[in-house]
Design a protein with these regions (language model features):
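Positively charged n-region of N-terminal signal peptides that target proteins for export
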Residues: 1-7
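Bacterial N-terminal signal peptides
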Residues: 7-19
């Protein structure tokens, strides 16, 4: 009689356990039955943590922090799609793909505190009410300090505050803290990656200061709105910033640019893209050197290291 009762009791127990799990708000599908030593044991199946990012800076930093972990990082937009076009992308042709990615995603990394129009989290939330927002510029819960914003800065994506090593380090801190809470088993590796990243930034800062001490002329003019944080972090002398499009550089404006460069003995003119030949000629006529720096690269830490190195080399040609 006993052999018959035991399987029946086991079946009833399993049914009761499933009901109890449902009452407790747990999904019975997330558990599997393991039978060992004559007993049935419930083991929760492990779900891989999935994180979405769409901007070069958020995806790039997340990739560095999550290297060597089992956290699944998904690029939610094409790598070459500018942030300014992501609103139309996620609400248009990219909507089906984001809907699919978001359905089982745990978090979306964005920059809404810096760029209010950042569409990733709001649009992803339409497909998954449980998805968590990670704001890389300022923690949603205020648990850590956010990035330092320059007074009077219009901000948005163009200002690129992460071109400052201090700000990039703060962004990495914010992201690592949230990612470690989302994936506790990956936290030791995330923390190790964070420490290595910040060590690179500290080394960059120390070496930059020592190298710039040898420069005779630290005056620069920027023809881009992307480098205010970079030149400020290096304590350079910014004579002017004029980010007008090439089409707006009239002959009179070009003459005025050349005169300003000469009058202020400007050493370097910065741009994030190749300017027109007319602008190049005006810079040369003003006695300055044009330097085109990179933005929105795949590896933001390496990009910052390269930009700083190129800028210092241009300012210290004889060292």
């Amino acid at each position: 009689m006993r052999p018959v009762v035991r399987p029946l009791a086991l079946a009833i127990a399993c049914l009761l356990s499933t009901s109890a799990l449902a009452v407790d708000g747990l999904d019975p599908k997330a558990f599997k039955v393991n039978q060992g030593l004559g007993h049935a044991a419930l083991t929760q199946t492990k779900k891989t943590v999935k994180v979405l990012a769409s901007l070069p800076i958020t995806y790039g930093l997340a990739e560095v922090l999550l290297k060597g972990t089992d956290v699944q990082l998904e690029r939610a937009a094409p790598a070459n799609l500018p942030g300014s076009r992501q609103v139309s992308y996620f609400t248009g042709r990219g909507a089906p793909a984001l809907n699919t990615l978001a359905q089982d995603a745990d978090a979306a990394i964005g920059l809404r505190s810096l760029w209010a129009d950042d569409p990733l989290y709001p649009v992803a939330r339409r497909s998954n009410i449980r998805i968590v927002e990670v704001d890389a510029a300022r923690p949603v819960d205020g648990g850590l300090p956010g990035i330092a914003v320059q007074p009077g800065s219009a901000d948005g994506l163009n200002s690129q505050p992460w071109q400052s090593g201090n700000n990039m380090g703060r962004m990495a801190d914010v992201m690592a803290a949230d990612l470690g809470r989302l994936a506790p088993s990956a936290k030791p590796k995330i923390d190790a990656n964070l420490a290595a990243l910040k060590q690179r930034l500290l080394k960059l800062s120390a070496h930059s200061e020592a190298r710039l001490a040898k420069a005779d002329n630290l005056s620069v003019v920027s023809l881009s709105d992307h480098f205010a944080y970079l030149v400020s972090s290096l304590n350079l002398d910014v004579v002017a910033t004029d980010a007008r499009p090439d089409a707006d550089w009239t002959p009179q404006a070009l003459q005025a640019l050349s005169a300003r460069l000469k009058d202020n003995d400007v050493a370097v003119v910065l741009q994030h893209r190749q300017p027109s030949e007319a602008v190049k000629a005006a810079v040369t006529a003003g006695g300055a050197q044009l330097l085109v720096l990179n933005v929105d690269g795949a590896d933001p830490v390496a990009e910052l290291e390269t930009n700083v190195d190129q800028l210092i080399k241009t300012l210290t040609p004889d060292t």
